[in-house]
Amino acid sequence: MYRTSITLAILALSTASVAQIDGAASVLQRYGNLELERTGPTIDAELGQKYLRRGNTYSNLERFEEAIDEYRKAISADPSLADALRNLANTYYYLERFDEAKPLLARFIRLQTTNTASLIAAVTTLGELERGDGNYAASIAFDLHAIELDSDNDSQVHIMANTYNNAGEANKAIAVYQKAIEVMPGNAFFDRSLGRILEQENRIEDALQAYKSAAAKNPDSSFYSDLVESTRSRL
């Protein structure tokens, strides 16, 4: 279910990325800090690159267990080697060993300082994994961050919100739409969707404000103006 094109981007794209987020730390705490045996007392970047190249060679040959071993050696030699963390995470993900991929993705995210496609892929994938496991307290941080990072991806917003709402986590669904409105303010359907959940939670006045916002963004739409009037009549 999780094997999407997003995952392939984790392996293929460059490693420069953005700021740390609290969710990554919580994943590391839950799944452990990926304690790897160190081969020496100091970081050896050159050795790390050597193991990384060997891991990539094995991965290209689809000798994944050998690739895993080399990537782990690379991380042991240089714990901040983002390429090795990302590629090892991607390998575990491909093999559907998701619990082993999670802390690696979290470590990769924490190392990043700029926004790139690799970071977007890592944050989005980790949010999907946590959401898929029902770890909503952890997934919400990644999901909100993914919306910030990928401001053109409106489809992921509805997937996130519907998952939370269907799981009885309406407040998280509301937070998703609020973040989406902040990042993509011109999308009236986000306001409409937010209003629907607020109505569901019997927050009618808040729902009315959301519908008014949608109507203001689409003044020629009778659908939104009618929604405003029907909601106002309930107060």
Region locations from a protein language model:
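Start-of-helix register in tetratricopeptide repeats
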Residues: 49, 83, 117-121, 155, ...
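Canonical tetratricopeptide repeat
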Residues: 53, 87, 94, 121, ...
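Register position in tetratricopeptide repeats
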Residues: 60, 94-95, 128, 132, ...
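Conserved structural position within tetratricopeptide repeats
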Residues: 42, 73-76, 109-110, 114, ...
